[in-house]
């Protein structure tokens, strides 16, 4: 595991939970002696849904809803087995989606 790199992508609808989770990951990796790059904020996806307010006619009256997906990227360079073990035991909130690539 000397020349490996772990790339972690985090996604969440709430940016505060996302930032707290990324700080937890960075602190855990740094405490085990690994070199960390990030968290890098990636572009936010914005999904907009337009619906009619009335059930039948009144097509001019519409309402728009949006949901934003915030993303962060963290690279852990040259992780030790201790780093991987600490990251596996890390407890993160339920609203955060995590993708890990080696």
Curated annotation (Swiss-Prot):
Subunit text: Part of the 30S ribosomal subunit.
Family to which the UniProt record says this protein belongs: Belongs to the universal ribosomal protein uS10 family.
Gene3D superfamilies named in the record: Ribosomal protein S10 domain
GO CC aspect terms: ribonucleoprotein complex; ribosome
Database matches in PROSITE patterns: RIBOSOMAL_S10 (PS00361)
Superkingdom in the source lineage: Bacteria
InterPro entries tied to this protein: Ribosomal_uS10, Ribosomal_uS10_CS, Ribosomal_uS10_dom, Ribosomal_uS10_dom_sf
Function: Involved in the binding of tRNA to the ribosomes.
UniProt-recorded name of the protein: Small ribosomal subunit protein uS10
Listed GO biological process terms: translation
Gene Ontology molecular function: structural constituent of ribosome; tRNA binding
Keywords for this protein: Ribonucleoprotein, Ribosomal protein
């Amino acid at each position: 595991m000397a020349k490996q790199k772990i790339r972690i992508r985090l996604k969440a609808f709430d940016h505060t939970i996302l930032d707290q989770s990324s700080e937890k990951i960075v602190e855990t990796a740094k405490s085990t002696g690994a070199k960390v790059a990030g968290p890098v904020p990636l572009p936010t996806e914005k999904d907009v849904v337009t619906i009619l307010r009335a059930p039948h006619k009144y097509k001019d009256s519409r309402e728009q809803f949006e949901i934003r997906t915030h993303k962060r990227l963290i690279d852990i360079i040259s992780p030790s087995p201790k780093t991987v073990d600490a990251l596996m035991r890390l407890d993160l909130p339920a609203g955060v989606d995590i993708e890990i690539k080696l």
